[in-house]
């Protein structure tokens, strides 16, 4: 690297993240079973225009934290690997390191170490670890279960259309949509507190339609969706494109969960106390696939979420 070499970048991250010494390996202690998740953020596909590098660093942590939230587990430790172009400036490295530090502080994560590389574009890889006796599965839903989602959905898709394609909207809505892209909020506290009531759950970052279809498939049940989890202002912005933003947009970092109806009152109470927005979107029944009920019609909801290499 011409302006900064690897050791200088490592020192910046160590200073920001509180790591004093480098080692060949890292040691940490967890009780119960180890829960792990890794995710990669690539500049060309995952960092939209106007997203700051610190926000991108936080997003790469959030991508993992969101999966922990869906499983009802709090992440405790992490490993971060970074790839920077050789001409990266010190200020950009500082900005990224600060973004990681703030994210780890926000979610209570201790960074153990990582790896540093040089390449054509910025790449962040994050691996997080936690512990739990068990996790909430994707395949546990039963007939007559209620389907809920933390939410609402569609703002991120709207924000991306504003940032990428310069779509216009009301000033207040545009600000809200862009914030959904640059500062997503995984629902960790809600997931941890309520996991005992979930029969199944799954993160929705690849798109709500993907999540619903995967959960229905793994549970060998039919998911009937009779309530779209969006707010009125999204409909005003999206018009005919509303369903695409809500069900296929992706990158919301919310999660879907199913519960026995007897736990509905408790779930709603806990959501209110934690200030977590949740929406009842449907129910589980016998059969297969996902059905969207609208205007007294059953419309198949296909998986059209985000997939790499498609």
Curated annotation (Swiss-Prot):
Residues bound to Mg(2+) 5: 206
Keyword annotations of the record: ATP-binding, Kinase, Magnesium, Metal-binding, Nucleotide-binding, Thiamine biosynthesis, Transferase
Record-listed Mg(2+) 4 binding positions: 24, 67
Pathway stated in the Swiss-Prot or TrEMBL entry: Cofactor biosynthesis; thiamine diphosphate biosynthesis; thiamine diphosphate from thiamine phosphate: step 1/1
Residues reported in the UniProt entry to bind Mg(2+) 1: 38-39, 115
GO-annotated biological processes: thiamine biosynthetic process; thiamine diphosphate biosynthetic process
Note, other: Reaction mechanism of ThiL seems to utilize a direct, inline transfer of the gamma-phosphate of ATP to TMP rather than a phosphorylated enzyme intermediate.
Function: Catalyzes the ATP-dependent phosphorylation of thiamine-monophosphate (TMP) to form thiamine-pyrophosphate (TPP), the active form of vitamin B1.
UniProt protein name: Thiamine-monophosphate kinase
Annotated source species: Nitrosopumilus maritimus (strain SCM1)
Gene for this chain: thiL
């Amino acid at each position: 690297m011409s302006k900064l070499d690897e050791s200088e970048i490592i020192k910046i991250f160590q200073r920001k993240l509180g790591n004093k010494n480098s080692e060949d390996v890292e040691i940490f202690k967890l009780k119960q079973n180890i829960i792990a998740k890794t995710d990669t953020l690539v500049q060309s596909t995952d960092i939209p225009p106007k997203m700051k590098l610190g926000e991108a660093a936080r997003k790469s942590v959030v991508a993992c934290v969101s999966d922990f939230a869906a499983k009802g587990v709090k992440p405790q430790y992490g490993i971060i690997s970074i790839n920077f172009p050789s001409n990266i400036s010190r200020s950009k490295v500082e900005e990224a390191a600060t973004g990681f530090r703030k994210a780890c502080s926000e979610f209570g994560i201790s960074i153990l170490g990582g790896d540093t590389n040089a390449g054509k574009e910025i790449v962040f890889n994050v691996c997080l670890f936690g512990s739990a006796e068990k996790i909430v599965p994707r395949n546990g839903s039963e007939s007559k279960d209620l389907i809920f989602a933390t939410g609402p959905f569609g703002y991120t898709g709207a924000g991306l259309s504003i940032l990428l394609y310069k779509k216009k909207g009301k000033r207040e809505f545009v600000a809200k949509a862009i914030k959904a892209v640059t500062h997503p909020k995984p629902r960790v506290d809600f997931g941890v507190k309520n996991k005992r009531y979930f029969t199944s759950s799954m993160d929705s970052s690849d798109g709500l339609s993907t999540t619903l279809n995967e959960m229905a498939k793994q549970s060998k049940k039919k998911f009937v969706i009779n309530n779209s989890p969006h707010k009125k202002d999204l409909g005003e912005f999206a018009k005919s494109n509303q369903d695409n933003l809500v069900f296929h947009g992706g990158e919301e970092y919310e999660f879907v969960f199913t519960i026995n109806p007897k736990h509905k009152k408790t779930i709603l109470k806990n959501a209110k106390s934690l200030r977590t927005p949740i929406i009842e979107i449907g129910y589980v029944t016998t059969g297969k696939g996902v059905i969207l009920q609208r205007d007294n019609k059953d419309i198949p909801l296909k998986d059209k979420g985000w997939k790499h290499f498609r």
